[in-house]
Every structure is written in C-alpha cells, then in structure tokens.
C-alpha cells in the first residue's frame, strides 16, 4: 500500500509517521505504533480492551507460526470490511487502534 493511501486512512488522527519495518511498514501516531502494513494489508493495533470488538466485526488477528510450530498471536488485527466503505467506520477502528497504543505505552511506563 502506498504511503499516501495510508495517510488518508489515518487522516482522522492527523499526519502519521510511516517507517520501514520487517519487510513492511510501521505506522505511528505521536510516537506510538498504531498499525503495521505487511504484504499490502494494514493491520490495526488492539489489546484486551479492543480485541473483542475486532473479533465481533469479523476481523482476523495476525498470527504466525513460532519455532515450536505453535501459532503466535500478535496484537494486530485486520480492518473490518465495513470500514473500507464508510469513512466514519474507518475512523472508529483507527481511533480504537490509537487507544490501544496509548494503553500499551501507559502499561510499559509502570
């Protein structure tokens, strides 16, 4: 996905910073990572508070196979399909990702 498309997707927050990351891109807002782009897909950050909403909307959690062959779940979820058709829906999911990033930053400072 082109950086301009990513900027548009996250415009509800304001300008985001996009950095290369592990063959994809890390998407940051005010210094906190809120999403990743990998293989053309943007995955939004979620946590124990917001993950149930992503799951209920049919989003998929990013997972990869670890060294032991067991799935390792990452704190990133696909964007629910309705968000691509409705800008208000996209704004809601983007805000949830930012809220999760803020909670993660707060927890790491403790």
Where are these regions (language model features)?
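Charge-dense, helix-prone N-terminal extensions
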Residues: 1-110
């Amino acid at each position: 996905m082109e950086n301009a498309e990513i900027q548009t997707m996250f415009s509800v927050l304001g300008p985001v910073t996009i950095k290369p990351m592990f063959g994809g891109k890390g998407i940051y807002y005010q210094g906190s990572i809120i999403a990743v782009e990998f293989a053309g897909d943007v995955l939004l950050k979620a946590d124990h508070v917001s993950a149930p909403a992503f799951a209920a909307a049919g989003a998929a959690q990013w997972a990869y196979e670890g060294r032991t062959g067991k799935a390792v779940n990452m704190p990133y979820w696909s964007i629910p399909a309705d968000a691509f058709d409705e800008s208000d829906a996209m704004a809601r999911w983007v805000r949830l990702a930012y809220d999760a990033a803020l909670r993660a930053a707060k927890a790491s400072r403790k």
